[in-house]
Amino acid sequence: MAKKISIVVSVYNEELGLTQFYDHTSPILKDACANAGWDYELIFVNDGSRDASLDLLKGFAAADDHVIVVNFAANRGHEAAMIAGIDIATGDGIVCMDADLQHPPEAIPDIIAKFDEGYDVISMVRTEREDAGIFKKVTSAAFYKVMNQMSKANFENNSSDFFGISRRVALVLKKDYRERVRFLRGYVQNVGFKKTTLEFKASARVAGESNYNLKALVKLSLNAICNFSDAPLKMGIYAGMVSLAFSFILIIYSIVQFFLGNAPDGYSTLVVLISFMFGVLFIILGFISEYLAIIFAEVKNRPIYIVDSIITKNGEERNE
């Protein structure tokens, strides 16, 4: 029996570029699998889109037996959509990618080749991004540097949600990595097994705008930090030590100035110290709140996603 590759695509309000993605990706996938002797399935996960994305996906499924559409009951987020796709995928190898063509389908033959070589994890690393400004490049580089410093895990610079995993890695993710607050690319980077890296150039979006605004990126960053590091919880200890040392120096300085007859203005010093301490304390409190929110989400044990329906061959739809 031929091996199968599952392509998982998260979709949220992508109607403007969805047809272009399908028309571009489908023949590349078909040719790559024919050359490698693999079968394939193309899994679209509709993450509660409010536009015509679902109608387009139903059309793809009706015309193409390889297309499967997983329709969420409500928007659950990009990572939940990828997890759902991984859960339902039946392939020996699974590739997650976005629907905006920033993740090039042309890389699929190389990914299949790596699966044939026995790799379990194929990490896709961006070497260039056409629509990324200086701010995004700097903050992205800083994020991965901070993550590698704060945690024992290893994060490749410019890694993305474009990756390939083997069937056994998918089963590990399905069984053991079911956190309600998660950082999927971090799990993939650090799950272990035989791993390799491929590079790609991220093109500009084919249409529409990115669904990742600044708020979403900040949330993703906080999730990553809190999932892979306990360093923020230790900030209070370090901040206390620094504050104690600073206070000791200030006391010595004040005593010396007093005996020299140059007593410092106590009000200004007090305002600066209080402002500094409150700033540090609120940062620490914010991180503690994030950890508590994660614990709260885990205790509630609510589902990561809820599937409304699955559309398979010839447009057949079944409710879940």
Feature names for model-found ranges:
Residues 1-27, 31, 35-38, 317:
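N-proximal low-complexity "stem/linker" segments adjacent to membrane-targeting elements
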Residues 14-17, 49, 104:
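Donor nucleotide-sugar binding loop of glycosyltransferases
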Residues 33, 40-43, 54-88:
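Conserved donor nucleotide-binding strand/loop of the catalytic core
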Residues 43-54, 101-102:
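A conserved acidic beta->alpha catalytic loop
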Residues 72, 97-99:
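Catalytic metal- and UDP-sugar-binding loop of GT-A-like glycosyltransferases, i.e.
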Residues 94:
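Short aromatic/hydrophobic "clamp" motif used to bind/position activated sugar donors
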